[in-house]
Design a protein with these regions (language model features):
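Alpha/beta enzyme core
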Residues: 15-106
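N-terminal basic/disordered segments at the start of proteins
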Residues: 1-15
């Protein structure tokens, strides 16, 4: 494992106890707004101090998270055109490496 990967993982997984608490708010991607997650900005703000990282989509990050958010962001970079059918694995990469770098995500 190279230095950059170790550095990013150390920001997500606490080196003190080797554990992580990730707040995953990428659920709306599959089924639309989830109850209590309709206003992500209001939902995320009070929980930030309790989390080691935040998992979120690019659009939700841009619209619902302040740039001074205190914890690392793990970006969901996959997406699909439909949730119809049994198989939800019909996804592609939807975020470029350049976009991920611009967003400074882990």
């Amino acid at each position: 494992m190279d230095w950059g990967l170790k550095n990013r993982l150390a920001k997500i997984i606490s080196p003190a106890d080797n554990r992580a608490l990730m707040l995953a708010v990428d659920h709306g991607y599959f089924l639309g707004p989830t109850e209590k997650l309709e206003d992500l900005k209001k939902t995320i703000a009070p929980l930030a101090k309790h989390c080691d990282s935040l998992m979120i989509t690019r659009g939700a990050l841009r619209t619902s998270v302040n740039p001074d958010y205190p914890v690392p962001v793990v970006l969901r970079v996959s997406g699909g055109t439909s949730i119809i059918g049994e198989d939800l694995s019909q996804e592609d990469i939807t975020v470029s490496i350049k976009d991920a770098l611009r967003l400074n995500v882990a």
